[in-house]
Amino acid sequence: DMNTKQKIKESFQKEHKRASKLVEDPKRSEYLSLKLEGIMESDVNVCVTYDPTKFGPFIIGTTSIPEAGIYSVCCAIQNLWLAARAENIGLGWVSIISNDVLREQLDLPEHIVPVAYLCLGHVTNFETKPDLERSGWLPRLELKDVVYYEKWEQKEGESWNVIQEMIKSNLNYA
């Protein structure tokens, strides 16, 4: 429904403007110029939610890590993203949006957690670099700078060296 999309787009615009006040110029102007949503032009918009009551009061894995259910939803979103890409369908995750507006516009019950608002559609091409890297907003971090072995900030270890070699030989990336 275009009216629903419009209300959600208005939420994006409000949140985007609010977020821009946290950034000083010239970075603010750069932030405001980034394409961070495709709500109106995408073929399909999907609000992905988590229902912590769906499987009853006991859900395996959530007693020690209560957020595990939301993490599982995020993994499902990643799988959807990969499948969309394989089918030449673009997918964007709009995170600059009010969950309260999503709840109101989509009549979500109070216990339902909005996890992601996704925009899917056919695109003319896929960029070789992610948008934020291409625009210079953020650099791509090397795997060795974000993965540690056994201890925080420990970058060396036999298993880690094996993993790095596998990546280098198979993906030409590490």
What is the meaning of each model-derived region?
Residues 1-73:
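Glycine/small-residue-rich phosphate/adenosyl-binding loop
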Residues 41-44, 89, 110-114:
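Short coil/turn connectors at secondary-structure junctions
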Residues 37-40, 108-110, 139:
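Solvent-exposed alpha-helices and their adjacent loops that cap or buttress functional pockets
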Residues 17-23, 107-132:
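A glycine-rich helix N-cap at a beta->alpha junction
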Residues 46, 54-55, 59-105:
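Small-aliphatic-rich amphipathic alpha-helix that forms the alpha element of a beta-alpha
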Residues 117-174:
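C-terminal helix-cap and adjacent tail motif
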Residues 50, 96, 122:
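Short secondary-structure boundary segments
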